[in-house]
Regions:
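Short, conserved phosphate-binding/catalytic loop or strand-edge motifs used
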Residues: 15, 21-23
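Chitinase-like catalytic core of GlcNAc-active glycosidases
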Residues: 1-15
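Catalytic-core regions of glycoside hydrolase
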Residues: 5, 24-178
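Catalytic domains of carbohydrate-active enzymes that cleave complex glycans
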Residues: 177-188
Length: 188
């Protein structure tokens, strides 16, 4: 059923796919079950379409505060190495530094795919997060397999942060939060 749904999206032109296991419990939250499903999808869908990007997954334990046992290492050893694993850092909403990447990459046996929960504001709905984007390590570019931001439900208001996030990922070592924010305001 999963591959059928992905096939329908493929026919519409989608070439990048993600399967999310965040915020679930029970049998579906077990690393071996998740790895098995992702390997199945890779074998029976992704590899049948050479133009499809590697599969991305969000684990149930997507931050260090919620990690425990051998969940992450089980994903890393049982799941195909090309599957990218999302990671939010030490907590749900956090900035990510070099030592954070070293820890998670060792757990997974691969480079993590950063999922920055910013500028999403579902945890502070009375505020719009449009300030400078800062706090992530400027020396982690070689340690990540990808990077995405979780925007607010307000698309236009999210653009300031997303502009800076794109600037950051384009050239991490040279990123300057104040300059990027000023450029975003001028451009948008």
């Amino acid at each position: 059923a999963v591959c059928q749904k992905l096939e329908g999206m493929y026919e519409l032109g989608v070439r990048s796919f993600a399967i999310f296991f965040d915020d679930i419990w029970g049998e579906g939250a077990k690393a071996d079950k998740q790895a098995g499903l992702l390997n199945y999808v890779t074998d029976n869908f992704v590899r049948k379409h050479p133009d499809v990007m590697p599969l991305i997954m969000c684990p149930t334990q997507y931050n260090k505060a919620w990690s425990g046992g051998d969940y992450l290492s089980t994903l890393g050893t049982r799941m195909y190495p090309e599957v990218r694993v999302m990671w939010t850092g030490n907590s749900v909403v956090d900035m990510i530094e070099r030592d954070d990447m070293e820890w998670i990459n060792q757990q997974l046996g691969r480079k993590a795919f950063i999922w920055l929960n910013y500028p999403v504001n579902d945890y502070c709905q009375s505020r719009m997060l449009m300030g400078k984007t800062y706090g992530n390590g400027l020396d982690i570019n070689e340690m990540v397999s990808g990077f995405c931001s979780n925007p607010m439900e307000y698309a236009e208001a999210s653009k300031v942060s997303l502009y800076s996030r794109a600037d950051y990922t384009w050239n991490m070592p040279a990123y300057d939060a104040t300059s990027s924010w000023n450029q975003a305001i001028a451009a948008l």
